[in-house]
């Protein structure tokens, strides 16, 4: 059973179609792209047998610089446009809480399994937001509401740039 009702997404390459995202939500989608790159980098690091401490450092850095400010945007800017009891609102909050807990666990003590759980959850969470939550918002919110979201996102940008020097994910065997 997946935690907090998280639905895994299984699909073949033939079923994947690019999503035409509203310009109002594109800043969040760009950040999601960075999140998927994080997932790929951690998986590559695990595959390359990168030292757990190095993965912990990178995860902590990515949390502070990308995930935490991104969660702020979603929780303080998007969620007010959904009723607190809406299933998608509850799922977003629950998944954010679970990701936070995993990152705190990794910060204290981590093993490879913790990283696998984290990247699987982040990937599933991003897919939920892109394929369900954002589509719902685009279909149900007014142009005025969407513009308000966009303006708030512009006031609280998350830097979508990589400032991590050790590219452990590119190494054959990182130690």
Q: Where are these predicted regions, by residue range?
A:
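Small-residue-biased structural context
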Residues: 3-175
